[in-house]
Amino acid sequence: MKLLAIVGTNADFSYNRFLDQFMAKRYKDQAEIEVYEIADLPRFKKEAQPDSKVEEFKNKIREADGVIFATPEYDHGIPSALKSAMEWTGSHAQGNADVMKMKPAMVLGTSYGIQGASRAQEEMREILLSPDQSANVLPGNEVLIGHAADKFDKNTGDLLDQETIHAIDLAFNNFVKFVEQAQK
């Protein structure tokens, strides 16, 4: 199984990058997980033609059996870099339709506060379910990781909190089954 884990920010430092890297390492026996950075994607503009970075991004999604989105929360929503990346996959102006159509998607995230990027995750799910995306999002498979600074080692990126690891294990196993069902 081939999964694409998208780091949902262009920030130099991100606990969500640590989260994607943790998943790629922990579940390497269950799936090939490629961590993908969106930092170099150009800002979406409807009139612009997609450059090679955008084409690479769309092709990575097309080639994956499923996509994992790890998003932080900025001002009760997803970062503008992630929104822009999703606009590249959903815009009909550049023939991008169907990049995410029926693609199994998992959304999770971590934040400094107590709510674990809950509003950003909800916004991301709404985007994925929009008519221009039409992704296949597993309902109820949520992982809200609050107080990221207390749960990750800032220097190594290691996830230290066993309760959080258990929650991710459950959600990831659900997602793997979901992807397998979608492939039938």
From Swiss-Prot:
It comes from the Bacteria. Disruption phenotype: Cells lacking both LJ_0548 and LJ_0549 completely lack the NADH-dependent flavin reductase activity detected in wild-type strain, and show a 40-fold reduction of hydrogen peroxide formation upon exposure to oxygen. Reductase activity and H(2)O(2) production in this mutant can only be restored by in trans complementation of both genes. It catalyses: a reduced flavin + NAD(+) = an oxidized flavin + NADH + 2 H(+). InterPro entries: Flavoprotein-like_sf (IPR029039), FMN_Rdtase-like_dom (IPR005025), NAD(P)H-dep_reductase (IPR050712). Keywords: Flavoprotein, FMN, NAD, Oxidoreductase. Transmembrane segments: none annotated. This is NADH-dependent flavin reductase subunit 2.
